[in-house]
Every structure is written in structure tokens, then in C-alpha cells.
UniProtKB/Swiss-Prot annotation:
It is a multi-pass membrane protein. This is Photosystem II CP47 reaction center protein. It is found in: Plastid, Chloroplast thylakoid membrane. Keywords: Chlorophyll, Chloroplast, Chromophore, Membrane, Photosynthesis, Photosystem II, Plastid, Thylakoid, Transmembrane, Transmembrane helix. One of the components of the core complex of photosystem II (PSII). It binds chlorophyll and helps catalyze the primary light-induced photochemical processes of PSII. PSII is a light-driven water:plastoquinone oxidoreductase, using light energy to abstract electrons from H(2)O, generating O(2) and a proton gradient subsequently used for ATP formation. InterPro entries: PS_antenna-like (IPR000932), PS_II_antenna-like_sf (IPR036001), PSII_PsbB (IPR017486). It comes from Chara vulgaris. The gene is psbB. One of its GO terms (biological process) is photosynthetic electron transport in photosystem II. The keyword Transmembrane applies. GO terms for cellular component: chloroplast thylakoid membrane; photosystem II. Belongs to the PsbB/PsbC family. PsbB subfamily. The chain crosses the membrane at residues 21-36, 101-115, 140-156, 203-218, 237-252, 457-472. The keyword Plastid applies. GO terms for molecular function: chlorophyll binding; electron transporter, transferring electrons within the cyclic electron transport pathway of photosynthesis activity.
Length: 508
């Protein structure tokens, strides 16, 4: 047929049978990729330390999505929460992967069948005998079925009525587990961090979809609207479908990057704004103050801080610290976290407690400055020693650790104090294993960053695709030079511009 690569889809334009075939094949590829990717991730995933080496540190992409829908067990005998299990059942990680691959194979066969048997009676208009699709009717069917699925997910899966529920956690990502959710029907359901809104919105949207589907099945569109929106043209379907997809992609980019109940930090890692706002630092400080007010010593108060919470308060887990071309999981950057050294408390020789000013997100290097509780600079690591007034040596800074591996250990050696001051810039101080994965020390992004980046890029691309195909549909007659309502017979080749009698070709 000699079509250029960008016009090959023309072959399914007026061929409903093969249009279905290519869509089934596309679904087969998507399902096959999902199953294969899940198996690959399970092959490289190390479930041994859910606290310091969770899935998001290891760069897992599909495992978090399975987990948030209620899958937590593996046929390998482990659970995502760390305990050993004996009977994972069919709906394990491997079970879901296998189902996707089996579905992919069946869809592959169905696509071949529909490609071979393309000329079915079903696709022919009984009045004209030509291939035709009743697009408004198909729209109604799809709307009804997707509404049914949406309602079923909200009413049964999320609520635990017939299903596992979804991943629910506290605001600080400490106590996450899969549990059933009650729908939130009040204003609180619109809080993006309230999981009850997920149930209620799916139920409401599902009911709306079912009713809208039944409406479109029982009511034909008015002729003017049908013509104005080119409802008889399958490219209209393409254009509006692309619009739906890019709109959804923009929405999920936002819910992923800014955080929501649907993107828990235990599965996708913390957001950059939690570092920017000192979210975990404030919670840790609150817990320490509470413990000391209850009579615990400083050391005991810091020892009560969960290692998981301390690990969130570390800049290397900020998804905005990764670079665009730094491929690979976070563990390939700063290494695999081994343990928390404890909270470093700095003091000068006058007894002032000093706080290291933390590095902002978009800095690669940042001056090491130590301030007291009033914000007055007391010490720093000078760039030029000759002019320094606040150097560690001059001020006599010492460091003592509370909680963690170095609990109650103090250092006064200036070189050691400087080392820990530099590391305190990055939040809580952890020990990392950089040899196992040959980690290069350069921060990587979490799946939260990769998901956002990918979906924003494709949303932008699909936005232009929507404009392109929408324009082609609406202005088809202008582009083709044929009035769609023309009644007179047109002979191809007589006119230079098709259907324009003023451009009749001159014969020699």
C-alpha cells in the first residue's frame, strides 16, 4: 500500500473488525508488560528490610501499585510488612503477574482471530450493507460498563465488602497496612489525604457512569449535535479518548507529586514538600518534647523515635534530589541504608545548643552553618580559614549523639565534628552500604519522581495529539477540499482541487 509510517493507521479507518483487532493487541501488550515487569521486579526485590530498604528505595514501580490495591504476600514466603507467611493464596504478587501474562496470551489470540475474521455481519449497516459502527451506542455501552466497574471497585473492593480494602497509613507513614475503608460522604471526602473519599467518589462516579451509559443507550443524539461534533467519524472517538487520557495523566501527576491518600509515602516514598516544610523534623521534635515532659531522659526520648520516621527525615529520600538523567533506584545513589547513627546535638564551649542549617532541595552544595535556638550564627565551616571567626576550632564545637547506634557517644575532635556537621545538613544521619551496589554517591529520585515526570511528559504529548486529531475531525472537509454535504457526483481527476468546478483541468 506504500503508506508512510505516520499514516499506517489509515488501514483500520473503515474496517471495524481490524480496528477491534489492533485494540485487543494493544491491551495484550499492556497486560503483558505489566505482568512481565512485576515478575522482573519480584526477581530483583529484596524484602528483608521494610524499614531502611523499602520498595521505593529499590526503585520498584509496579509493586507499589499492586500493594496499594491490597496485595501484600508473595509465593516466596514473605510479606511486604516484614513477617513470614505460609499461605499467600492466589492473589499474591506472583499470582497477579501470572494472571496478567495469561490474559495477555488470550488477548493475543483474540487479536489474531479478529484480524483474520474481520468482515463480520455485525459490523455492516443493515440499511446500506457497508461497514459501519454505531459510535453513540458504543459510547453508551462503554460508559455503562466502566461505570459498573467504577461502582464495584468503590462499593466492594475499597470498602472490604468483597475484597481486601486498600493500603491505609497514618500521616507520617509509620503504621501502614491494607484495611477496609468506609466511604466519606461529607465535605471531608474532598480532602485528598482522606482515603474515605476514594470509596465515596468511586461509588458516586460509578452511579453517574451507569446512569449516563443507560441514557446514551436509550437516547439518540440530535442531528445537529451529531453533525457538529462529527459523531459519525471514528477520529472523533480518537480525539476525545486522547483528551480523557491526558486529563487523567495531568491529575495523577499532581496527586503523585504533591501526595494524596492514593499515593502513600510507605509505597512511593515521601514528597519533596515534606522535606521543604520540615514535616518529619517537626513531628520528631514534638515526640521528643513529649517524651522529655513525661520524665524520659534526652537519650531515652530519642531512642523512642521509630527508625522509619527518622529515615523519612533525610534529604536523600526527597524525590526532587534526583537528576533527570540519573537512572536507577535510590539505593544506586547514596547506597543501601544500614542503620541510624542517632540524632546529632552540637554544642559550643559556652554551652549553647547549635542546629545545623539544612540544605534546601535544589542545592547540590550548601554552606555549613550552625545557629543557636534564636537563629544567631555561632559556628560554620569557613571557605577561607584566614578570615574565619566562627570555625569549629575557634568556637570549640562538640557533638553528642542520642538514640541510634551512637547513643550517648560524643566527639570533640574538630575533624570528626566537621564530618557530622556536613552530614547533619542532610537531615538525620545514617550509615550506608555503598559497596554492594557500587553506589556512586549521587542522589537518585524515587518512583514518585519518575511517575510524575513520565505522566507529565505523556500528558503534554497527548494534549497536542488531542488538538491534532480534533482539528482533523472538525475541519476534515477543509483539509480534504470536499464539502461533506455535497450531493453532486464528483469524478476524481477532473478538477485540480477536488469538487471545485472553478479549477477544471485544461486538456491540451
Amino acid at each position: 500500500m506504500g503508506l508512510p509510517w505516520y499514516r499506517v493507521h489509515t488501514v483500520v479507518l473503515n474496517d471495524p473488525g481490524r480496528l477491534i483487532a489492533v485494540h485487543i493487541m494493544h491491551t495484550a501488550l499492556v497486560s503483558g508488560w505489566a505482568g512481565s515487569m512485576a515478575l522482573y521486579e519480584l526477581a530483583v526485590f529484596d524484602p528483608s528490610d521494610p524499614i531502611l530498604d523499602p520498595m521505593w528505595r529499590q526503585g520498584m514501580f509496579v509493586i507499589p501499585f499492586m500493594t496499594r490495591l491490597g496485595i501484600t504476600k508473595s509465593w516466596g514466603g514473605w510479606s511486604i510488612t516484614g513477617e513470614t507467611i505460609t499461605n499467600p493464596g492466589i492473589w499474591s504478587y506472583e499470582g497477579v503477574a501470572a494472571v496478567h501474562i495469561i490474559l495477555s496470551g488470550l488477548l493475543f489470540l483474540a487479536a489474531i482471530w479478529h484480524w483474520v475474521y474481520w468482515d463480520l455481519e455485525l459490523f455492516r449497516d443493515e440499511r446500506t450493507g457497508k461497514p459501519a459502527l454505531d459510535l453513540p451506542k458504543i459510547f453508551g455501552i462503554h460508559l455503562f460498563l466502566s461505570g459498573l466497574l467504577c461502582f464495584g471497585f468503590g462499593a466492594f473492593h475499597v470498602t472490604g465488602l468483597f475484597g481486601p480494602g486498600i493500603w491505609i497509613s497514618d500521616p507520617y507513614g509509620i503504621t501502614g497496612k491494607v484495611q477496609s475503608v468506609s466511604p466519606a460522604w461529607g465535605a471531608e471526602g474532598f480532602d485528598p489525604f482522606n482515603p474515605g473519599g476514594i470509596a465515596s467518589h468511586h461509588i458516586a462516579a460509578g452511579i453517574l457512569g451507569i446512569l449516563a451509559g443507560l441514557f446514551h443507550l436509550s437516547v439518540r443524539p440530535p442531528q445537529r449535535l451529531y453533525k457538529a461534533l462529527r459523531m459519525g467519524n471514528v477520529e472523533t472517538v480518537l480525539s476525545s479518548s486522547i483528551a480523557a487520557v491526558f486529563f487523567a495523566a495531568f491529575i495523577v501527576s499532581g496527586t503523585m507529586w504533591y501526595g494524596s491518600a492514593a499515593t502513600p509515602i510507605e509505597l512511593f516514598g515521601p514528597t519533596r514538600y515534606q522535606w521543604d516544610q520540615g514535616y518529619f523534623q517537626q513531628e520528631i521534635d514534638r515526640r521528643v518534647r513529649l517524651s522529655t515532659s513525661q520524665g524520659f531522659s534526652i537519650s531515652e526520648a530519642w531512642s523512642r523515635i521509630p527508625e522509619k520516621l527518622a529515615f523519612y527525615d533525610y534529604i536523600g529520600n526527597n524525590p526532587a534530589k534526583g537528576g533527570l538523567f540519573r537512572a536507577g533506584p535510590m539505593d544506586n545513589g547514596d547506597g543501601i541504608a544500614v542503620g541510624w547513627l542517632g540524632h546529632a546535638v552540637f554544642k559550643d564551649k559556652e554551652g549553647h545548643e547549635l542546629f545545623v542549617r539544612r540544605m534546601p532541595t535544589f542545592f547540590e552544595t550548601f554552606p555549613v552553618v550552625l545557629v543557636d535556638e534564636e537563629g544567631i550564627i555561632r559556628a560554620d565551616l569557613p571557605f577561607r580559614r584566614a578570615e574565619s571567626k566562627y570555625s569549629i576550632e575557634q568556637v570549640g564545637v562538640t557533638v553528642e549523639f542520642y538514640g541510634g547506634e551512637l547513643d550517648n557517644v560524643s566527639f570533640s575532635d574538630p575533624a570528626t565534628v566537621k564530618k557530622y556537621a556536613r552530614r547533619a545538613q542532610l537531615g538525620e544521619i545514617f550509615e550506608f552500604d555503598r559497596t554492594t551496589l557500587k553506589s556512586d554517591g549521587v542522589f537518585r529520585s524515587s518512583p514518585r519522581g519518575w511517575f510524575t515526570f513520565g505522566h507529565l511528559c505523556f500528558a503534554l504529548l497527548f494534549f497536542f495529539g488531542h488538538i491534532w486529531h480534533g482539528a482533523r475531525t472538525l475541519f476534515r472537509d477543509v483539509f480534504a477540499g470536499i464539502d461533506p454535504d455535497i450531493d453532486s457526483q464528483i469524478e476524481f481527476g477532473i478538477f485540480q482541487k477536488l469538487g471545485d468546478p472553478t479549477t477544471k483541468k485544461q486538456t491540451v
